[in-house]
């Protein structure tokens, strides 16, 4: 089943050329320092429930096993992790761009108090509202389950902020192909996004990486007249 999915995957026209950790911030408006002579980099953010597999997906995406680490206190960690990532056009290495991959703190952890949830909302909301260079958000959800209330609230925040986002269904290797197609349609309807913006993925089987790469490259306009 998984091999069939891999064969049907879109070919990646971009590749990751570099990936490294920059900084973890405790204020939503705090950003990595801009090197003199450089312009501020565009940002691509990843967000999702605690234990959705966000760190594993980020590591799969950049092909670095331990770049993003799992929080020891799911639902309570309020830091935004920034990574410097380079992406290049496969057929011409001279065409490329660097961007900031932003790992936002997880939400929806059952043991977290209402006060902690409000703090998360204010913290992440502050980042989303004030990040002028944010180009796109990947919202991760576990493909095995129905849309959760916290996921629906997150999608409402993104829609309300008019921030473009795509849904990434994680852990696809755990279910059948027929179930995948069914869940893709369910999540597209639940989050009010076109089906083509719902990506089926698996960090374990490296499913969905090509589609993620192509979307990021297109959002950043890597292959444009300016590059």
Predicted regions and their residues:
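Conserved G1/Walker A P-loop phosphate-binding module
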Residues: 2-109, 222, 226
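Canonical P-loop GTPase G-domain recognition
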Residues: 16-31, 174-227
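Short, glycine/charged-enriched secondary-structure capping and boundary segments
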Residues: 35-36, 61, 114-117, 152-156, ...
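Structured catalytic cores of enzymes that bind and process phosphorylated ligands/cofactors
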Residues: 44-52, 58, 65, 84-87, ...
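Catalytic acidic motif of RecA-like/P-loop NTPases
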Residues: 59, 106, 145, 173, ...
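Amphipathic alpha-helical transducer elements in NTP-driven molecular machines
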Residues: 77, 117-121, 209
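Flexible beta-alpha connector loops of hexameric P-loop NTPases
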Residues: 107-117, 174-176
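Conserved C-terminal guanine-recognition region of P-loop GTPase G domains, centered on the G4
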Residues: 121-196
């Amino acid at each position: 089943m998984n091999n069939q999915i891999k064969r049907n995957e879109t070919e990646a026209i971009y590749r990751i050329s570099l990936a490294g950790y920059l900084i973890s911030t405790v204020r939503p408006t705090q950003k990595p320092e801009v090197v003199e002579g450089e312009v501020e980099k565009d940002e691509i953010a990843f967000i999702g429930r605690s234990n959705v597999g966000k760190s594993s997906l980020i590591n799969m995406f950049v092909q670095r096993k331990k770049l993003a680490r799992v929080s020891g206190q799911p639902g309570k960690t309020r830091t935004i992790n920034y990574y410097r990532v380079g992406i290049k056009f496969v057929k011409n290495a001279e065409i490329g761009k660097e961007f900031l991959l932003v790992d936002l703190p997880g939400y929806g952890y059952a043991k977290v108090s209402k006060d902690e949830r409000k703090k998360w909302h204010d913290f992440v909301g502050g980042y989303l509202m004030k990040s002028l260079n944010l180009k796109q958000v990947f919202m991760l959800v576990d493909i095995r389950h129905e849309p959760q209330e916290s996921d629906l609230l997150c999608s409402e925040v993104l829609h309300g902020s008019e921030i473009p986002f795509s849904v990434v269904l994680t852990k696809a290797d755990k279910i059948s192909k027929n179930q995948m197609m069914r869940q893709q349609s369910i999540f597209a309807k639940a989050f009010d996004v076109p089906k083509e913006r719902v990506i089926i993925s698996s960090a374990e089987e490296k499913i969905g990486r090509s589609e993620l790469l192509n979307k990021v490259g297109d959002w950043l306009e890597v292959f444009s007249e300016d590059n």
